[in-house]
């Protein structure tokens, strides 16, 4: 018997559309929470595939980095040119608890600061906070005209630039190495370090637009859940009852 195709068999209809499944039905929304050092805690939402088999949704979320405008976190448009990076470290329920991961300026702000007839001074230094976070801070400053100055330009001499840069690194080292990451974040928001540099360098050459333009996280310590929960205003300690001390009494069996 010859083996081959049987043309008389009914063929399946070609061109039938396959049933398309919406990929969003397999995903869940999670709320991103900013640390308590910022005024606005609800940053936004993120999508992740649901937990299936060995793939855990929490593992997919941990380590995610989100970039948020500081103006949104502080509810102040004056901070619109600064961007904050937050890293997801822990997932509790539908909330992603984040920690500070870095800070940067928008490119349009940096370009607007650079002008003619003035000197640009930059400095960067690697510091370690008291809670063992290794950070690299980048500072930027510009010279300005002295009072009653007639000369058009405000160029600083090479020796003055070196002296200013040395002062900048000293102040950044002092301010950053004597506090925790949370305390440093609190200093960066109102630009305390920039004002300190401006005051300290008045005797060398007057400065303007002094900013910590970038903060880069190089190394983080071992993850501590308790520290993260404290950062978010929560606690991981369980409420325990008070221990009651009672005298030991030996049971005496009655004779039958």
Curated annotation (Swiss-Prot):
The modification N-acetylalanine is found at residue 2. InterPro entries: Ribosomal_eS1 (IPR001593), Ribosomal_eS1_CS (IPR018281), Ribosomal_eS1_euk (IPR027500). Pfam families: Ribosomal_S3Ae. The keyword Acetylation applies. Its main location: cytoplasm. It is found in: Cytoplasm. One of its GO terms (biological process) is translation. One of its GO terms (molecular function) is structural constituent of ribosome. The keyword Ribosomal protein applies. Keywords: Acetylation, Cytoplasm, Ribonucleoprotein, Ribosomal protein. PROSITE patterns: RIBOSOMAL_S3AE. One of its GO terms (cellular component) is cytosolic small ribosomal subunit. Belongs to the eukaryotic ribosomal protein eS1 family. Component of the small ribosomal subunit. Mature ribosomes consist of a small (40S) and a large (60S) subunit. The 40S subunit contains about 33 different proteins and 1 molecule of RNA (18S). The 60S subunit contains about 49 different proteins and 3 molecules of RNA (25S, 5.8S and 5S). This is Small ribosomal subunit protein eS1. It comes from Botryotinia fuckeliana (strain B05.10). The lineage of its organism: Eukaryota, Fungi, Dikarya, Ascomycota, Pezizomycotina. The gene is rps1.
